[in-house]
Swiss-Prot record:
Cu cation A2 binds at C195, E197, C199, H203. This is Cytochrome c oxidase subunit 2. Pfam families: COX2, COX2_TM. The keyword Cytoplasm does not apply.
Length: 226
């Protein structure tokens, strides 16, 4: 996994697919507007012709009033749709709970005999050659792909934020409040995230690792806790 890529990470969930589409759609509009303005500026600077009889132009004013309204509507429609779908819950098969602490995460699989464990960052001097500095943890959150999963999150102390960019998920972990989001992964793999809310001295050292596997491996992993 290249951690120095430009632009966005590769998508691994439907939510992030929609976010990437919205990003590209918005950038296309912004680039078009920028090029149009530059063209008009360049044309006017180099134009020696002057219309001395133009006092007002109702048609031009109508165009530059209605056009921005249409552009904003075109941006707002997919934006509201994505905002709604990120909070929508449907047919979730598994529920897990993520609890933020200073400065680590703990996970609870309450659907399966109350399985609980803590997830700490692996110090740099204990990393294996195939592990990532400041991103790998001693206990990964293992979940099956192609299954709708409900993620609950809260905090035991200060406000944290449970964020995995390649899955298009970011939730505030607030003390005394339970937030939820739907997670759906396309394929197996390791997905890395970090706390995205400044929460104290070691804020930069509480990573998140999601290991996406097939359901049979997930069941065998659950049996190891029995």
């Amino acid at each position: 996994m290249n951690t120095w890529l430009l632009s966005l990470q590769n998508s691994n969930s439907p939510t992030y697919d929609m976010m990437i589409f919205f990003h590209d759609f918005t950038m296309m509009i912004l680039i078009f507007i920028t090029l149009l303005i530059l063209f008009i500026m360049f044309t006017m600077i180099n134009n020696n012709l002057i219309n001395r009889f133009l006092l007002q132009g109702h048609f031009i004013e109508l165009i530059w009033t209605i056009t921005p309204m249409i552009i904003l509507i075109l941006i707002a429609i997919p934006s509201f749709k994505i905002l709604y779908l990120t909070d929508e819950m449907f047919n979730n098969k598994i529920t897990i709970k993520s609890v933020g602490h200073q400065w680590y995460w703990s996970y609870e699989y309450s659907d399966f005999l109350n399985i609980e464990f803590d997830s700490f960052m692996i110090p740099s001097n204990q990393l294996n050659p195939n592990e990532f500095r400041l991103l790998d943890t001693d206990n990964r959150c293992i979940l099956p792909f192609n299954y709708p999963i409900r993620i609950l999150t809260t905090s035991m102390d200060v406000i944290h934020s449970w964020t995995v960019p390649s899955l298009g998920i970011k939730m505030d972990s607030t003390p005394g409040r339970l937030n939820q989001s739907l997670l759906y992964m396309y394929r197996p793999g390791l997905y890395f995230g970090q706390c995205s809310e400044i929460c104290g001295t070691n804020h930069s050292f509480m990573p998140i690792v999601i290991e996406s596997t097939n359901f049979s491996y997930f069941k065998n992993w659950l049996k190891s806790f029995l």
